[in-house]
Amino acid sequence: MASTKMGALNETECTFEFIKVAASQTLTKGELCTVDASGNAIVCPTNYAGATQTYVIDEDITTAAGETSRVARFVKTGPCAVKIDAAVTEGATIMPSDATAGQIEVFAGTNYNLMIGYARPTEVGGTNARIEINKTR
């Protein structure tokens, strides 16, 4: 069954970071994000080979052109519901999607730098999945 809640699922088990959001961004709760060269949050690009800093945004936020002072809360590690672009199976290792920015998919291939966590045993499927982000770099 798909989770109806996006973002952090258990705040006591999560590690959060508060990050400035880049200008001209619309980030929705449950999207996979990363930071740009300036350290501002953006939607994670497809098949993001440099997935050294990935987060799941825990709130909806929209920034205007030139606006870089708004801060949002992101899940760095722990259980959260995130948008998926394809079916995710229980226990599967997950990575940034190679088809849809801001979403995840089951890990495939040999580039282990893409792995960001694994699917939790419940609430898997539908348009979002419960995952455990356990990669910290």
How should these model regions be labeled?
Residues M1-R137:
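Glycine-anchored, exposed beta-strand/edge motif detector
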